[in-house]
Amino acid sequence: MLIAQRPTITEEPVHDTRSRFVIEPLEPGFGYTLGNSLRRTLLSSIPGAAVTSLRIDGVLHEFSTVPGAKEDVTEMILNIKELVVSSEHDDPQVIYLRKQGPCEVTAADIVAPAGVEVHNPDLHIATLNDKGKLEIEMVVERGRGYVPAAQNKLPGHEIGRIPIDSIYSPVLKVTYKVEATRVEQRTDFDRLIMDVETKPSMRPRDAMASAGKTLVELFGLVRELNVDAEGIDIGPSPSDAALAADLALPIEDLNLTVRSYNCLKREGIHTVGELVARSEADLLDIRNFGQKSIEEVKTKLAEMGLSLKDSPPGFDPGRVVYSASRSDYDEDQRYIETEQL
């Protein structure tokens, strides 16, 4: 079975961390199938980074207080849980915060190694008076989902090391709805609209791409049971279909001069696809096909967004504007007379 039109996905940004994605047209019923799978994957399985444990100078446990600080350790930990970080490292990384009062301590005061970034520097952590001093060492790790503090407490943890709950997921909220959409005479196709909101550490489009990659990997396991099994085939994308149509055009549709057209036909070049498969050097080897004909062909192809096999990127037809002149007409007439002889 072949879907009449390949589904397309478009992004409608709401702001930097929120976008709506529209996927259509989908076969009837596939809107809910795809929407539910993507939503659950986005909320549970997108990799991210978070603080897993910390150590505060002079503090042995989370029920302590820090001299000169307005907040107790429990309040500081609650604030640190809101820290949005990203890490390019697979192994744990240590970030530091050292501050002397009087001042407000924010995430902007954190010193992180290369590859680790704090995305909400305005986050309030603590308030110190003139006698206050705060030194915190935090461990940042990569993971996914939610991990409670009990699981972050590893055997052999040093005294004073406080494990905390870690929320790795960079996705905050995902909703979706399915509407009916029309394809030609059928009105029962699905239109899936997904609303994705993320933390500043990841763009919504990157979260969607990550979820899609995860689902492809998992569904691939099922496909491996029988790679020759029949299923629904997705048609070519509109751009691929348009390109295929252009390549199938006969060279008559290029409206070339008589000389260029006859030379190409004599060489056995009948379609645009056969023409773009040739290089400029190949065409110059054709009898009576000179540089002027080359420029004409390149200009016609550039108007279609195509080029010869060895044409340099960014060929600008505006720099070589070809138009048939009286001399070209006379040259074609001489060519025709020669051919008739």
Swiss-Prot record:
Biological process, per Gene Ontology: DNA-templated transcription
Gene Ontology MF annotations: DNA binding; DNA-directed RNA polymerase activity; protein dimerization activity
Region (Alpha C-terminal domain (alpha-CTD)): 241-341
Region called Alpha N-terminal domain (alpha-NTD), residue ranges: 1-226
One Pfam entry name: RNA_pol_L
Cysteines paired by S-S bonds: none
EC number: 2.7.7.6
Broad class of enzyme this protein falls into: transferase
The keyword DNA damage is assigned to this record: no
Gene Ontology cellular component list: cytoplasm; DNA-directed RNA polymerase complex
Keywords: DNA-directed RNA polymerase, Nucleotidyltransferase, Transcription, Transferase
Reactions catalysed according to its record: RNA(n) + a ribonucleoside 5'-triphosphate = RNA(n+1) + diphosphate
General function of this protein: DNA-dependent RNA polymerase catalyzes the transcription of DNA into RNA using the four ribonucleoside triphosphates as substrates.
Subunit note: Homodimer. The RNAP catalytic core consists of 2 alpha, 1 beta, 1 beta' and 1 omega subunit. When a sigma factor is associated with the core the holoenzyme is formed, which can initiate transcription.
Similarity annotation: Belongs to the RNA polymerase alpha chain family.
Domain notes: The N-terminal domain is essential for RNAP assembly and basal transcription, whereas the C-terminal domain is involved in interaction with transcriptional regulators and with upstream promoter elements.
Protein name in UniProt: DNA-directed RNA polymerase subunit alpha
Species for this entry: Acidothermus cellulolyticus (strain ATCC 43068 / DSM 8971 / 11B)
Gene coding for it: rpoA
